[in-house]
């Protein structure tokens, strides 16, 4: 683990990291999040019967769009030419609820962790928004980086 925060200057001021001299490499990040809900809410979403429409399809697109706008949402994030973004949403009947997995990929000079995390977060928020009329007690949890590959800092995988 790195001991220094890369976005802070000598006086503690926030700065955008200069990545100009870094090598371009293929970088991938996978993030996940969960939306817990009542079993009946999950059943309604999976059946495609939510009043607002296709919850899963809309959340998937929202996550993809959010990843592309990460640099506009998070200060000091570099704009990236993303080569792939995918958002997968699967039922988890044990929660009960939905598991969101977002993958972001780029060939560039900086990582895509924030893009994957933003995609997962916004997909979860969209699920909540589209189903809140029937279940305001839904819980968004477990947003985290699961895996990253590429770049100077090396690879990372949860539990490894």
From Swiss-Prot:
Entry keyword set = Lyase, Molybdenum cofactor biosynthesis
Assembly and oligomerization: Homohexamer; trimer of dimers.
Query: Could you say which residues bind substrate here?
Result: 76-78, 114-115
Q: What is this protein called?
A: Cyclic pyranopterin monophosphate synthase
Its UniProt entry gives the catalysed reaction(s) as: (8S)-3',8-cyclo-7,8-dihydroguanosine 5'-triphosphate = cyclic pyranopterin phosphate + diphosphate
Specify whether Lyase is a keyword of the entry. yes
> GO MF terms on file?
cyclic pyranopterin monophosphate synthase activity
Question: What does the record give as the function of this protein?
Answer: Catalyzes the conversion of (8S)-3',8-cyclo-7,8-dihydroguanosine 5'-triphosphate to cyclic pyranopterin monophosphate (cPMP).
Q: What class of enzyme is it?
A: lyase
NCBIfam families for the chain: moaC (TIGR00581), PRK09364.1 (NF006870)
Species of origin: Mesorhizobium japonicum (strain LMG 29417 / CECT 9101 / MAFF 303099)
Entry EC no(s):
4.6.1.17
Which biological pathway?
Answer: Cofactor biosynthesis; molybdopterin biosynthesis
Family to which this protein belongs: Belongs to the MoaC family.
Q: Which residues form the active site?
A: 129
In its keyword annotation, does this UniProt entry include Lyase?
Answer: yes
Which GO biological process annotations does it have?
Mo-molybdopterin cofactor biosynthetic process
């Amino acid at each position: 683990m790195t001991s220094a925060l890369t976005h802070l200057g000598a006086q503690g001021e926030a700065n955008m990291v200069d990545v100009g001299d870094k090598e371009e490499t293929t970088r991938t990040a996978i993030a996940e999040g969960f939306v817990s809900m009542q079993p009946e809410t999950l059943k309604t979403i999976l059946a495609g019967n939510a009043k607002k429409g296709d919850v899963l399809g809309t959340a998937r697109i929202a996550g993809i769009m959010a990843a592309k706008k990460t640099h506009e949402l998070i200060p000091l994030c570099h704009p990236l030419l993303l080569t792939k973004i995918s958002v997968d949403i699967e039922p988890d009947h044990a929660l009960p609820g939905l598991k969101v997995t977002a993958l972001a990929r780029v060939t560039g000079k900086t990582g895509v962790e924030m893009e994957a995390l933003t995609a997962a977060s916004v997909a979860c928020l969209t699920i909540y928004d589209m189903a809140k009329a029937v279940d305001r007690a839904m819980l968004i949890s477990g947003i985290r980086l699961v895996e990253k590959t590429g770049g100077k800092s090396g690879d990372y995988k949860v539990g490894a």
